[in-house]
Amino acid sequence: MARSLACFKLEQSIGREYTSALPQPERQMSTFSYPAFSAKNVARSPVTSGNGYKCPNCGTELSPINAGKTYSCDNNHSFDRAKEGYLNLLLAQHKRSRNPGDSDEMIRSRQRFLNAGYYQTLANAIIEQIPALTPDSRLLDIGCGEGYYLQAINKARNDLQLVGIDISKTAVRLAAKRRFPAQLAVDSGFNLALFDNSIDCAISVFSPISASEVARVLKPEGLLIMVGPGEQHLSGLTAHIYDNQIPHGGNFKALDESAEFSLMGQTDIQQSISIQDSAIGDLLRMTPYYWHATAEQQESLGKLDKLETEIHFNIRLYQNGSVPE
């Protein structure tokens, strides 16, 4: 049975609109200095081995050498730091293709669409769920993409230690070019190069996760915020593609059936939006619907000046471990 968490309340709100502005991203290198957190004017606890990354080969701590240009473990496994500031910790055996993750076109389309503010409602709703996290809490975005939601969180809570991973190298590179402090790595959400019990809160926005792997890296009673599509999500777009639309079923089944997590609460966010001009094509290309649309449907959508659609998100809050009755 879902319970409310007093210090981390999920408000029930359907159709609510949020008006506070989100930061517009700047294409600059992240100011994060791995692995030390660099935000100012906040008291810091010492950085321990659990606050960094572990070697994906042997599981020992990665430490900087060569003026921080390379990270190496005691067994001499080494990983070069990209010029943008991120690490690539994705091993070949954890890849299913040469370039895993979303295509470059999908990622850049999503970046343009999100930067235009169409999902501002969702970003604000996520931010509403984290005020109880204490300074220096470590928040992980699993499938962070090009960093839109992490940057929004940093704007609201610059006292948190932010960590973002994505299996797409292109996405992580774009995230690293945003001007906000975060530990960023190319990594698999199913084989996280993070220490056990090292994360206070994890979020996942439309990204697949491994319940057991997230439970491993979360601290006891740590929190997981999962975002999935509501039944009417993008119904205005799918009406142009399918004759018979099937409501979204969400992506929570594995978590709801997991012994590792307890559901604490959930909320639906629903809003009607009007998408303009080239953003319509970006929306189509950033979703799997692009591959379901015929060439004629893609062309027809590309000619639209305006698209009216619902955006509908289901946000669920889980706690790591069972909750006493």
Can you say where each PLM-predicted feature lies in the sequence?
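N-terminal auxiliary segments of SAM/dcSAM-dependent transferases
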Residues: 30-99
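Conserved Class I S-adenosyl-L-methionine
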Residues: 50, 269-325
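Class I SAM-dependent methyltransferase Rossmann-like catalytic core
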Residues: 96, 101-121
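Conserved class I S-adenosyl-L-methionine
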Residues: 136-145
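Conserved SAM-binding loop of SAM-dependent methyltransferases across substrates and taxa
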Residues: 146-158
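Conserved beta-strand signature within the Rossmann-like core of class I S-adenosyl-L-methionine
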Residues: 222-232
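Conserved SAM/SAH-binding beta-strand->alpha-helix loop
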Residues: 166-170
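Conserved SAM-binding strand-loop segment of SAM-dependent methyltransferases
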Residues: 180-192
